Amino acid sequence: MVPFFVQIKCKLGQSYAVANALAEAEIASEIYSTAGDYDLLVKFYVDNDTDIGHFINEKVQVLPGIQDTHTIITFKAFGAR
């Protein structure tokens, strides 16, 4: 499995609706509300052969209330168990 993170900027007043939609879709491992330029930080895992760009385009960016996304590809988790 390949982990990656997506920062999500929501339309005004839509952060909780977007977070709930992600949770209901059962595609995210973890969902956090954040302060700063983005409203949510979401951790995903996909199979090694999954096209991450296509996954984000087809499963994440189509959710109502999302204004912008920023994807973070990770390499190694330190201290992971």
PLM regions and their residue ranges:
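A compositional/biophysical signature of low hydrophobicity enriched in polar/charged and small residues
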Residues: M1-R81
